[in-house]
Amino acid sequence: MAKSKRFPVMGNIEEKKCLNAKACPLAISHESNRDCLIMNVREPEITSVTDLTDKELTLRWKSIDWKRVKEAVNNLQSRIASAAKNGNWKTVNKLSRLLTRSFYAKLLSVRKVTTNKGSRTPGIDGVIWSSSADKMRAALQLTNKGYRAKPLTRKYIRKKSGKLRPLSIPTMFDRAMQTLHSLVLGAIESAAGDKTSFGFKPYRSTKDAYAYLHLCLSKKVSPEWIVEGDIKACFDEISHN
C-alpha cells in the first residue's frame, strides 16, 4: 500500500521544509517556517503581511481547514503533556517553544478570542478583530518578539445585588497572546497539575467535584463536618504585591 504524502506540521523538533514547496497552499513567511498550513487554495509566495490586500487576507482566512489546524495543535499538546508526565522538562521546553511559534497555534488563538462572548469588547486601544482580514492579519503579526502587554481597561458591571463588579479587559492582541501561551500551560497542567482541582478547567465540571467529595467523605475515617466560607471581595482585597 502506497504511503500518503504528509506535510511536516509540528511533528519534529528539527527544522524541515515542505515536502513539495510548489504544492504548499500557503507559502507565507512568518516567525516559524515549521508549519505548512493546509488550505483549500494554492497561493504564491508572500514575503510579508504588508504585501497582502484585505481581499487576499480574507480568502486565506476563509479557506483554512480548521480540522487540520486543531489536529496539529492537539498533537503537539499531547507530546508536551507526555513529556511533562515523564518529567522530561528539556523536551517540554523545546516543544513549548514550537507551539508558541507555530502558525497553527496562532490561527487557533485568534479564532478563539474572536468567537467568544467578549469578542466585541475592545481593550484600551479600542481595537476589535471583526473581519476575516483583521483576523488573518492578527495571526500573522502574533509574535513574542518585542512584545509588551498593554494596560487593562477597567469597566464595571452591575450584579444582582446591585453592587458593581469590576472587570479588567485586555486588548485583543493581549488576549490572543494569553490564549496562545495557555495552549502550552494547559497541556503541562493536564499532566503535572493537581488532579483533584476542578475549578475553571476544561473537561471538568461540578459533577466531577461532587464525585470526588463523595469518594473522600464516604470512608469510615472521613471528616464528619464541612465548613463552607466566603471571603468578601477576595480577589479585589488580596494583596498582589
Report residues per predicted region:
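Non-catalytic, polymerase-adjacent accessory regions of viral genome-replication enzymes
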Residues: M1-M136
